[in-house]
Amino acid sequence: MAASMDEDITANPPPSSEEDPLAEERLGFVREVGAQAVWSLSSCKPGFGVERLRDNIMDTYWQSDGQLPHLVNIQFHKRTNISQIYIYTDYKLDESYTPSRISIRSGTNFNDLQELQVMDLTEPTGWVQIPIKDGNVKSIRTFMLQIAVISNHQNGRDTHMRQIRIHAPVEGKHYPLELFGKFGTVDFQKFATIR
C-alpha cells in the first residue's frame, strides 16, 4: 500500500443524479463484498447496531452512542480488492445526526491504518459514492477498512448511517472464442476442440 493520499473531497450530489450501487452490481461491473467481512462499531445505541447497516432497509440506521470520532471497522479474512464504498444517509430525516466529515482509512489491522481520504458531505440525502484509490490504481487491496465520522451537521454528537456497501471490481472476465476468429494453422486447429 502506498503512502496515504490525504485528499479532501466534497460531496453534495443533486437529487436528480442519485448514485445507485445496485445498478453497477446488476450490470456485473462490481460485486458487493461486505458480507465477507467482520464488522464492528466504536459504539451503538441498543437495537441500532451493525445489523442495521447491512439489512438493505433504508428506514433503519446505526446510531452511535459516545464521543466523536465514531468508527465503523470492516475486517476481511484475506486481502481484498476494494474499489468503492457507498454510504446511504438522509439529512432530511436525521439532521444533526448526519455526518458532515468522514475519513476513510485502510491497513492490515488497527495498528497500521493509513488515511486514504477525507470527505466533506453537505446535507447528503441518498447514496454517497466514495471511490477508493491508491495513487493511479483504481482499487486497493486491503485487510481492513475504517470509516471514521469526524463531525456531524449542526455540531451533532451522535451519528446516523443507514446503509454501507463495499464494492470490489469483478475480476477474470471471460470472452467467447468467437471474438478471436478461426485458427488458421493445423497446429492451432488441433486445440480448437475439447475431446
Swiss-Prot record:
Record Pfam families: ANAPC10
Gene3D superfamilies xref list: Galactose-binding domain-like
Record SMART domains: APC10
UniProt keyword DNA damage, yes or no: no
Leader sequence segment: none
Boundaries of every DOC domain copy: 9-193
The keyword Cell division is assigned to this record: yes
Reported function: Component of the anaphase promoting complex/cyclosome (APC/C), a cell cycle-regulated ubiquitin ligase that controls progression through mitosis and the G1 phase of the cell cycle.
Quaternary structure and partners: The APC is composed of at least 11 subunits.
Protein name: Anaphase-promoting complex subunit 10
Gene designation: APC10
